[in-house]
Amino acid sequence: MKENVLDVLMYLFENYIDEDTEIEPDRIQLQDKLLEAGFPGAEIDRAFDWLENLANQEDQPLGQARHDSALRVYTDREVERLDARARGFLLFLEQNGVLDAGTRELVIDRIMDLDAEDISLDQLKWVTLMVLFNRPDQEAAYTWLESMMFDSPPEFLH
């Protein structure tokens, strides 16, 4: 089983993150369950580090105003990791008010912190969903993206 950090994060998000859960399992319990599920210990540790970094960034105000006319220029490294469809998806979310500039930057930061060479559109959606879930006052944006991901029929390219 060749699992990466994003696979661990997606598994955690699908199985253990529930807005209605009152008792959250601790890190050791989760690590044990992830090991039982077959994830490598190193990837589990990196996934928890990724989540801690996300939580630490959540505590810091982003402090930037939205400029509708501003254009985000991606670095070469970001372009390697995020293809045109992924960058277009981020722009789509921002233009539709799902992401503001600060949250977009947080999504990009979390993507760049993963060890993957390139990120698929589905993986980007998952990371965006995780970021929105952890942002205060983003419940509507989270719900919108979640329903788009799970309630819409799959895209078929012909």
UniProtKB/Swiss-Prot annotation:
Belongs to the Smg family. NCBIfam families: PRK03430.1. This is Protein Smg homolog. It comes from Thioalkalivibrio sulfidiphilus (strain HL-EbGR7). The gene is smg.
